């Protein structure tokens, strides 16, 4: 079985906090739950458009220690993708608002659309960040 993971979800849903581009965001834990409970493999797929109009898909199996927490697994997924996003930002769906929520009283600059939300701070505390 396979599914496409939505990396950004509301902090009130099945989420944890991950760091991305120097900011915190709430991210799905569903792929991490499947990896832990069903011993599922997490395959990260990068796609790169080719000059002939085709698309090259590069699959990497994410290696996670058996003792990794859901947050650590979710962070490892993001850590896999962030370097390629930094190298080729034009290939990412920037219109999608990944940083909808931000911590109260943060000094980090977030996109204009990010809002403070109590549920985000609660998730940060539950994740051991606050």
Label every PLM stretch briefly:
Residues 1-130:
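Non-catalytic C-terminal accessory region of glycerolipid acyltransferases
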């Amino acid at each position: 079985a396979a599914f496409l993971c939505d990396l950004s979800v509301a902090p009130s849903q099945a989420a944890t906090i991950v760091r991305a581009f120097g900011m915190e965001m709430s991210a799905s834990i569903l792929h991490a739950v499947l990896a832990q409970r069903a011993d599922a493999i997490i395959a990260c797929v990068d796609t790169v458009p080719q000059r002939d109009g085709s698309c090259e898909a590069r699959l990497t199996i994410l290696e996670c220690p058996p003792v990794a927490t859901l947050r650590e697994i979710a962070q490892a997924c993001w850590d896999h993708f962030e370097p390629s996003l930094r190298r080729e930002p034009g290939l990412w769906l920037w219109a999608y608002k990944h940083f909808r929520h931000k911590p109260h009283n943060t000094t980090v600059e977030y996109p204009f659309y990010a809002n403070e939300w109590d549920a985000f701070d609660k998730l940060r505390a539950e994740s051991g960040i606050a």
